[in-house]
């Protein structure tokens, strides 16, 4: 249906209202796309202003348009803007890290585990710092984001993580184009994996596995410049 230039092909699975003509004259230039990519960054200085719903809808639509393995299209999206629920996400993450820190500092566990997991122990001071900042009323997890986008899949999806992170990048670039800051919630995902349960998913009414999480907010300022990344490591095999 999509490839036919004259519209002569029809299919019951793809009704006319679901197919759209591409106006290639409206495509951004390669330079514009590259500028969008290079200007995107995790701006953690956020205001208390909510992200307008129409912007959130565009961000979700961009995520939904990402490719999926075997064209499964099995991604689902949950947008959280309820301040109480956002607080619960932070509380949950801090709680998991606090329990982990206490376990790692148990004398018996420390004696057995530390020689083999030195990299893990370097995070104990980080966990404790996050806990103290959280107790002081700061928001070291969500950075005062006013919205969360959770991307989730059925647990049976073998490529759920890959699909979700492809969708995340689409959403991230759309958010950047809208002037909305976006931050990858690595701490929250780490807590989910560490706990190994569905606690947060159940709290948020999500049926499935949370694969990627984006915090969203209106930035307090925009960066006027970007800095080049490290030198590209590349190799062409010809």
Regions found by a protein language model. Give the residues of each.
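Acidic, surface-exposed loops and disordered segments
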Residues: 1-238
């Amino acid at each position: 249906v999509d490839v036919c230039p004259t519209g002569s092909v029809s299919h019951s699975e793809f009704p006319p209202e679901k197919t759209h003509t591409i106006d290639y004259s409206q495509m951004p230039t390669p330079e514009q796309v590259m500028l969008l990519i290079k200007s995107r960054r995790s701006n953690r200085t956020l205001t208390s202003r909510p992200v307008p719903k129409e912007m959130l809808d565009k961000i979700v639509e961009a995520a939904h348009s990402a490719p999926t393995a075997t064209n499964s299209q099995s991604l689902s999206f949950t947008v959280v803007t309820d301040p109480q629920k956002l607080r619960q996400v932070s509380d949950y993450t801090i709680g998991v890290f606090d329990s982990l820190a206490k376990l790692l500092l148990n004398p018996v566990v420390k004696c057995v585990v530390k020689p083999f997991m030195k990299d893990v122990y370097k995070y104990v001071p980080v966990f404790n710092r996050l806990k103290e900042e959280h107790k002081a009323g700061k928001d070291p997890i969500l950075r005062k984001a006013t919205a969360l986008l959770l991307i989730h899949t059925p647990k049976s999806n073998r490529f759920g993580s890959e699909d979700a992170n492809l969708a995340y990048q689409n959403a991230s670039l759309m958010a950047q184009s809208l002037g909305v800051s976006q931050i990858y919630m690595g701490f929250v995902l780490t807590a989910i994996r560490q706990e190994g349960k569905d606690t947060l998913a159940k709290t948020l009414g999500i049926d499935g596995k949370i694969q990627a999480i984006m915090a969203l907010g209106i930035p307090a300022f925009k960066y006027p410049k970007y800095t080049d990344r490290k030198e590209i490591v590349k190799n062409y095999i010809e």
